[in-house]
UniProtKB/Swiss-Prot annotation:
Motif 'KMSKS' region per record, residues: 268-272
Annotated gene: glnS
Family matches, as Gene3D superfamilies: Glutamyl-trna Synthetase, Domain 2, Glutamyl-tRNA Synthetase, Domain 3, HUPs, Ribosomal Protein L25, Chain P
Record-stated family: Belongs to the class-I aminoacyl-tRNA synthetase family.
InterPro entries xrefs: aa-tRNA-synth_I_CS, Gln-tRNA-synth, Gln/Glu-tRNA_Ligase, Gln_tRNA_ligase_bac, Glu/Gln-tRNA-synth, Glu/Gln-tRNA-synth_Ib_cat-dom, Glu/Gln-tRNA-synth_Ib_codon-bd, Glu_tRNA_lig_a-bdl
Enzyme class: ligase
GO CC term (a single one): cytosol
EC code(s) of this entry: 6.1.1.18
Gene Ontology terms: biological process: glutaminyl-tRNA aminoacylation; glutamyl-tRNA aminoacylation
Name the record gives this protein: Glutamine--tRNA ligase
Record note on quaternary structure: Monomer.
Binding site for ATP: 35-37, 41-47, 231, 261-262, 269-271
Length: 554
């Protein structure tokens, strides 16, 4: 992590500063507690940067704890991917990876303590009846007929639950709080439910599993967390967080603070919707470069530094808002403009023949970065037959068109000035070859007679060209807020992936996955980690040179 990434400020850091100044805490201990039931997305990156960033800046600790209380939906695959994402973003957790399941014995003991205090009971209402009895925002709930069981009966029934004596959905343990509470979360919430499923950490030791709200606060306390940071949807849950800790015998009582979650235009963050995109094969997987997952962004070519910078720029507030996709794209564009070496690739190729060029070819010198001589230069082969992009030639054009036109001149990047003389077309009228002449005395210099040549286009020597597949990725949805659509799948952008067969300069045969290039005049690209082969490299467009959606939105 670069020291240059300046320390941000926000309301949470102000709270921490006050806590340290008052002596309430002498150190800072945070945690990042994902559930291992899916891949992390850009919204999680905000929480990662906040929790790990605070620990880093205050020289404290941040735990990575997996909230693994639902074995039905969780998998070790997600555990490993989450660990990889956190490390890739540039952060390191304190000590060993932790799991909520590490505390199942203590959690069970605390549940028994609540039963002994008359603060928890075994309920045999069905899940549907529990929802019905809970009431609404405008109507109070009503007590379960099982609410007033004795402590002894509840202890026996809870042990029966643990021993597998009830079927799933036939019994649960509930907190005994207040069914008339204005906060629905406090209307006797479920603390334990039955699930006959093998757990990826504990195997078949348990058939009862604690709920998130019971587990989360106790895990925080057992780990000595000082500041428990959650998104705003858990604001009401803070009352239950405090109630549990106030009513069990535990020496540490962390405080929960809420911040706004990250909402991003032109995508969805809901795990259910992301899963639907994958299972219905609208995308090729969780790491599809159009997905907002960290693995998808990484495969597309986003850098960890650009994501950290994005999270820093959007800040941490209590107000929900939706961030423009252009803000995220701006961060990676700035990063790669500064750091990505340049290369030439022709995405929509058409053959160009220089009729007066003599010899088999030559090498021309090109800088790897126009503003960074320390990045060096490379030798690129040039010959009398080259590929140029079809969009860089017109038979006729107005003065605003600064590329190649019949009868006019243009410069080939770091090479010669050429003039278009004639074209050859196929039976359908498509141009197949452009025939040109060149000025042999203009290699990387102006014409001797002083004539001005304004346009510059890129090229690839046909004899040396590397055949490449180029995947032009764009925004996955065609509207800014796809989640608001009646059917979010109906607003998938049909142009979110366009595949082209093109040619690249031969140096790109040594490209490695994860290393970005600016394809001159085209955008920023990286080698695809999944589909590339030695015979046929595949390059993903990370982002264009400029925001082409700005005009679309106007």
């Amino acid at each position: 992590m670069s020291e240059a990434e300046a320390r941000p400020t926000n309301f949470i850091r102000q709270i921490i500063d006050e806590d340290l100044a008052s002596g309430k805490h002498t150190t800072v201990h945070t945690r990042f507690p994902p559930e291992p039931n899916g891949y992390l997305h850009i919204g999680h990156a905000k929480s990662i940067c906040l929790n790990f960033g605070i620990a880093q800046d205050y020289k404290g600790q941040c735990n990575l704890r997996f909230d693994d209380t639902n074995p039905v939906k969780e998998d070790i695959e997600y555990v490993e991917s989450i660990k990889n994402d956190v490390e890739w973003l540039g952060f390191h957790w304190s000590g060993n990876v932790r799991y909520s399941s590490d505390y199942f014995d203590q959690l069970h003991a605390y549940a028994i303590e609540l039963i002994n205090k008359g603060l928890a009971y075994v309920d045999e209402l069905t899940p549907e009846q529990i929802r019905e009895y809970r009431g609404t925002l405008t109507q109070p709930g009503k007590n379960s007929p099982y609410r007033d069981r004795s402590v002894e009966e509840n202890l026996a029934l809870f042990e029966k639950m643990r021993a597998g004596g009830f079927e799933e959905g036939k019994a649960c343990l509930r907190a005994k709080i207040d069914m008339a509470s204005p906060f629905i979360v406090m209307r006797d919430p479920v603390l334990y439910r039955i699930k006959f499923a093998e757990h990826h950490q504990t195997g078949n030791k348990w058939c009862i599993y604690p709920m998130y709200d019971f587990t989360h606060c106790i895990s925080d306390a057992l780990e000595g967390i000082t500041h428990s940071l959650c998104t705003l949807e858990f604001q009401d849950n803070r009352r239950l967080y405090d109630w549990v800790l106030d009513n069990i015998t535990i020496s540490v009582h962390p405080r929960q603070y809420e911040f706004s979650r990250l909402n991003l235009e032109y995508t969805v963050m809901s795990k259910r919707k992301l899963n639907l995109l994958v299972t219905d094969k609208h995308v090729e997987g969780w790491d599809d470069p159009r997905m907002p997952t960290i693995s998808g962004l990484r495969r597309r070519g986003y850098t960890a530094a650009s994501i950290r910078e994005f999270c820093k720029r959007i800040g941490v507030t209590k107000q929900d808002n939706t961030i423009e996709m252009a803000s995220l794209e701006s961060c990676i564009r700035e990063d790669l403009n500064e750091n990505a070496p340049r290369a030439m690739a022709v995405i929509d190729p058409v053959k160009l023949v220089i009729e007066n060029y003599q010899g088999e070819g030559e090498m021309v010198t090109m800088p790897n970065h126009p503003n960074k001589p320390e990045m060096g230069s490379r030798q690129v082969p040039f010959s009398g037959e080259i590929w140029i992009d079809r969009a860089d030639f017109r038979e006729e054009a107005n003065k605003q068109y600064k590329r190649l036109v019949l009868g006019k001149e243009v410069r080939l990047r770091n090479a010669y000035v050429i003039k278009a003389e004639r074209v050859e077309k196929d039976a359908e009228g498509n141009i197949t070859t452009i025939f040109c002449t060149y000025d042999a005395d203009t290699l990387s210099k102006d014409p001797a007679d002083g004539r001005k040549v304004k346009g510059v286009i890129h090229w690839v020597s046909a004899a040396h060209a590397l055949p490449v597949e180029i995947r032009l990725y764009d925004r996955l949805f065609s509207v800014p807020n796809p989640g608001a659509a009646d059917d979010f799948l109906s607003v998938i952008n049909p142009e979110s992936l366009v595949i082209k067969q093109g040619f690249a300069e031969p140096s790109l045969k040594d490209a490695v996955a994860g290393k970005a290039f600016q394809f001159e005049r085209e955008g920023y690209f990286c080698l695809d980690s999944r589909h590339s082969t030695a015979e046929k490299p595949v390059f993903n467009r990370t982002v264009g040179l400029r925001d082409t959606w700005a005009k679309v939105g106007e």
